[in-house]
């Protein structure tokens, strides 16, 4: 059964805190079943709110999905910016390490993959393009604008996304091909 993300009894959340709680609950549900496989009833139950309240705050299930996706993409941007700021002389390696650490957050990882998968919807596609473009522009700014380097960094990240979603690190001990996917990436396959 899904855990509730409501505030402790006796405390009142601000509107921003309530929105954040609902987005977190939505991310947990959407990351498991995607946009079309998730019910607003399940999200409301997890958040400890009424289902109509979701629509009052977000307007539609799609808007809530986009808010949850945006939060996941923002985690990536924040991790890249923080890593590059902490190690400006070796920003690429620091950002790569930060991304590998993010992969342990399966919820965010799966939210991004569900955003890509739901992009047959024009509204989702446009929002996901915008989020992905923001990541690419940030990587260009942090690493320099060499297109080949940026493409390589993004491609490595996408390979890691798919590999982590398929739990290839857990398979690496049994399958040599899975282990080869992580050579030199810093991913712990042990």
Please provide the spans of the model-predicted regions:
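Amphipathic alpha-helical segments used for helix-helix packing
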Residues: 103-122, 132
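Alpha-helical DNA-contacting segments of helix-turn-helix folds
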Residues: 65-72
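Short, intrinsically disordered or compositionally biased N-terminal tails of bacterial proteins
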Residues: 1-7
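Helix-turn-helix
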Residues: 18-21, 25, 29-63
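Short alpha-helical scaffolding segments that buttress acidic/His motifs in well-ordered protein cores
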Residues: 99, 112-116, 153-157
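Hydrophobic alpha-helical connector segments
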Residues: 67, 78-108
């Amino acid at each position: 059964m899904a855990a509730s993300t409501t505030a402790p009894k006796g405390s009142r959340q601000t509107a921003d805190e309530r929105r954040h709680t609902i987005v977190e609950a939505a991310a947990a549900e959407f990351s498991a079943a995607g946009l079309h496989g998730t019910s607003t009833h399940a999200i409301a139950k997890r958040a400890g709110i009424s289902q109509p309240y979701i629509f009052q705050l977000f307007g539609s299930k799609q808007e809530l999905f986009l808010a949850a996706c945006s939060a996941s993409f923002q985690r990536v941007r924040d991790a890249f910016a923080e890593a590059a700021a902490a190690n400006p002389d070796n920003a690429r390696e620091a950002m790569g390490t930060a991304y590998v650490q993010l992969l342990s957050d399966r919820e965010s990882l799966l939210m991004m993959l569900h955003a890509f998968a739901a992009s047959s919807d024009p509204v989702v596609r446009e929002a996901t393009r915008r989020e992905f473009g923001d990541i690419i522009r940030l990587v260009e700014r942090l690493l320099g604008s060499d297109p080949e380097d940026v493409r390589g960094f993004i491609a490595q990240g996408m390979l890691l996304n798919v590999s982590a979603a398929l739990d290839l690190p857990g398979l690496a001990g049994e399958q040599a091909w899975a282990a080869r996917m992580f050579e030199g990436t810093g991913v712990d396959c042990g």
